[in-house]
Amino acid sequence: VKRCCDEEECSSACWPCCWG
């Protein structure tokens, strides 16, 4: 399963996925 944010770079669009 490919995650939205699997790297240290976390764009605002990816926040819900990163911090969700």
Curated annotation (Swiss-Prot):
Which residues would be cut away as propeptide? Answer: 1-3
The modified positions for 4-hydroxyproline read 16
Record flagged with keyword Transmembrane: no
Drop me one GO molecular function for this one.
toxin activity
Location within or outside the cell: Secreted
Q: List the disulfide bonds.
A: 4-18, 5-14, 10-17
User: Which keywords label this protein?
Assistant: Amidation, Cleavage on pair of basic residues, Disulfide bond, Hydroxylation, Neurotoxin, Secreted, Toxin
User: What are the annotated GO cellular component locations?
Assistant: extracellular region
Q: Taxonomically, which superkingdom?
A: Eukaryota
Q: Which residues carry this modification: Tryptophan amide?
A: 19
Q: Coiled-coil segments, which residues?
A: none
Expressing tissues = Expressed by the venom duct.
Q: Know anything about its domains from the record?
A: The cysteine framework is III (CC-C-C-CC).
Member of which family?
Belongs to the conotoxin M superfamily.
Q: What is the protein's name according to its record? A: Conotoxin PnMLKM-D0211
Query: In which organism is this protein found?
Result: Conus pennaceus (Feathered cone)
